[in-house]
Amino acid sequence: MSLVEKLFGSFSDRELKKVNPIVKQVLALEPKYAALSDAELQAQTPAFKQQLADGKTLDDILPDAFAVCREAAWRVLGMKHFPVQITGGIALHRGDIAEMQTGEGKTLVATLPAYLNALTGEGVHVVTVNDYLAKRDSEWMGKLYRWLGLSVGLIAQGMDGDARRAAYAADITYGTNNEFGFDYLRDNMVTYKANMVQRGHAFAIVDEVDSILIDEARTPLIISGKGEDSSSLYTQVDRFARTLRKSVVVELEDKVSTDEQADGDYVVDEKHKTCTLTASGIKKAEAYFHIENLAAAENMTLAHHIDQAIKAYGVMQKDIDYVVKNGEVIIVDEFTGRLMYGRRYSEGLHQAIEAKEGVTVARESKTLATITFQNYFRMYKKLSGMTGTAKTEATEFTEIYGLNIVTVPTNRPKQRIDYPDAIYKTVNGKYRAVIEQVLECHKNGQPVLVGTVSVEKSETLAKMLQKHTRDFNVLNAKNHEREAEIVAQAGKKGAITIATNMAGRGTDIMLGGNVEFMAKAQMRKEHFCENLLSPEKPQDADPAAVEMLLAEANGHGDTEDANILAARNRFEELNAQYKPAVEAEAEEVRAAGGLFIIGTERHESRRIDNQLRGRAGRQGDPGASRFYLSLEDDLMRLFGGDRVSSLMDTLKLDEDTPIENRMITNTLESAQKKLEGRNFEIRKNVLKYDDVMNQQREIIYGQRRKVLDGEDISAEMHNMLRENIDSSCSQFLAGDVKDDWDFGALRRHYQGWLTTDADFRYTVADFDNISREGIADMLYNRGMQILQAKEVRYGAPLMRELERICLLKCVDRQWMDHIDNMDQLRQGIALRGYGQKDPVVEYRIEGFDMFDQMVDSIREDSVKMLLTIEIRQAGAAPKREQVAKPTGEGFVPGNGAPGVKGTPKGQPVRVIKIGRNDPCPCGSGLKWKKCTCAKFHPEGLPTDANED
């Protein structure tokens, strides 16, 4: 604790003192609102909205709004917010992080600020870590919101645009961080504003905020399309990588050459998780691929592939960093142990691992849009979050997001005992001690949860435990399908559960077991849902429908479906049947000491260790935790220092004798702090680079939004034409000596859209009568004539539509290429550091130069497309295509330039009649009567009279 905190208290302490009087106000209002009828209580919502309209602030109405929500929760859900939960709600409303321990009811806490802020009508986003929690909370808490007159939406995978739009239009919207982020990116790829789904970013409440804003911060959201076919170079380089000898060091010393530190062909730096070719490896590469110099510019692609291949072999470990399942390489989340379906390593690393594992190497992808969670969530006017473990990352939350942490007291005193670390000389000695402790707990009827850091280590421990008992469950990325069931029952008497990292599991471990899961297990056993869905042949019931019905058995959503109601009735019957036995068992487990948590290794982050400990001792229950460590653990070996090892040797301890030493524990915590600091710097560095892209992204998306908002951009298109012509004339007609002017290059540049082969065939005698400005004016006037002729032909509304389409398509295509170019720039920019230049500054300077070039390309491409496109077939207004398809689809290049064969001027226009309920030919997918084309052309769409 700092001197300032000792004198004045921490931010959290000061905030709690400020909040306590407000909490008392809310509690004092309980009798007032408890006396109201349901109708009178529900009438408070429109009354609050009116008060806001009359000039009151949210802070003014906070005590009353919280008191109303609290009373409504009691009437609708049978739950009433405790004083500490009101404290958490106030912290969230103020834009802070409420640090609340596991089991303290964070889901209910969020209803207070969500209800209050939803009264503004701007929308509240409640962000969860998975679809299950989003659905559960939206249904469960949705009953409360709807009773109070607010609408609730849910964003889930597989929903179409209309459903998403409706969900975002609701007062309160639940969804995962991924869904919110991807919807933002997709909204900035649409061609019509009506296709956007989000309506702004006013207020977000982020559940498990540390997981989303810290752990996920280095992983950008990427929408990608199909790129080039996967290069055969991956397999060639993989064959080469298999011939190399690996050398491993704890940490490479910067000032000592790689070759002096390693005798292999490449060296692996364990501490920093990097791989580097040695001189021997470089020679082998040059010989294998028959090249003279691997470092030459023409061999950059090959060198990059080799770097990724040796990283795949030297750093990336199967069943730790990834698993191979059904012929696919699937990333394992290092923080939660979950499989990350749909995620891929970037820069060719994923393909290198696929080649290493002998599975199909997937084709490369092209990035269409991207953003980091850091920059997405910083867009919200007000951001808040909840978690059980935020204090260790306080600096990052404050520096990056401007979020302060308020540690909310528990409702009941914590009874968990955290024992000192038990440290062993070897991993085997540690595992034997763990097994001994597990068996002792099991014998006493005490449930035990063993946390491991990888799939591989969980399976190693399971094999050792099998020699003594088979009565245990293993939860890792390979069998995550039973995750909720295993976690829910981990608190039963004598239960043994071995699991990879428990962060963000989302299901509370209840002592005595979980009644709901027992009820569902019985429903499965008796095939209740199958009999409902297919009474005559239960075995023929659709498995997907069975699972959906089972999920609804304990759902909270309103329904009139007879099957769902029957399933809920059966669920309630079983719930009531099992509850007494579970409560009795829970008392036995409490008497045995509650849940015992065993950590088998320290994580790089203290926060993940704290999350594991936090699974025990929920809501004042007893519990215990202890970490079993060894000198051979990665963290101890890489960061513990030699003094720990020498201490063990001095004490002459065998591998089965533990030591509880504060010095060793302090050394470990110091190492963890260093690692946390280093990882923070990495995330901060990622943000520095993404901030450059973010500034550019905001400019591009801002311009897109103006176009989508329906602004008339005809004047802007004319200015773009003028600027493009002036720029080209300055380039090709540079200087005052007309003999040096490159008329041929200017003619070729505009050939087919502004010039003909006959243009600019000047002789020296003509030079006195021409000027750069005159040529530019001639080209501009010619372009304007073409545009004016098109406007007469198609009509002003359709011409405005064409201008929008052309600009949006060119912006999107150039932006996609720019993302790739910036990515390539970033990959190579780090080398500037060797030249005493700041890579971030260099990236910013060159990035904005590239951005200016992109803007020039957008300008030229847009006016060129507008000048040359022609509607090709009857009724074909500009086709509303998906972004990233080949530009110009639905159009043929024409050209209205004088002397160039194209569509004749003055051609009669024919109108094609379209039925009101027919699909609009523009490709929007809407019926004619609902499409904007009907508003522009109520009589039908114009087309050439001579077209079929």
Residue ranges and their predicted role:
Residues 1-630, 634-647, 652, 702, ...:
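Conserved P-loop NTPase motor core
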Residues 33, 322-330, 336-344, 589-590, ...:
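Extended, charged helical/alpha-beta scaffold domains that provide interaction surfaces
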Residues 445-458, 709-710, 738, 764-768, ...:
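Short, Lys/Glu-rich amphipathic helical modules
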Residues 450, 498, 815, 851, ...:
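Hydrophobic, well-ordered secondary-structure elements that form the walls
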Residues 910-929, 933, 940:
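Short Cys/His-rich zinc-binding micro-motifs
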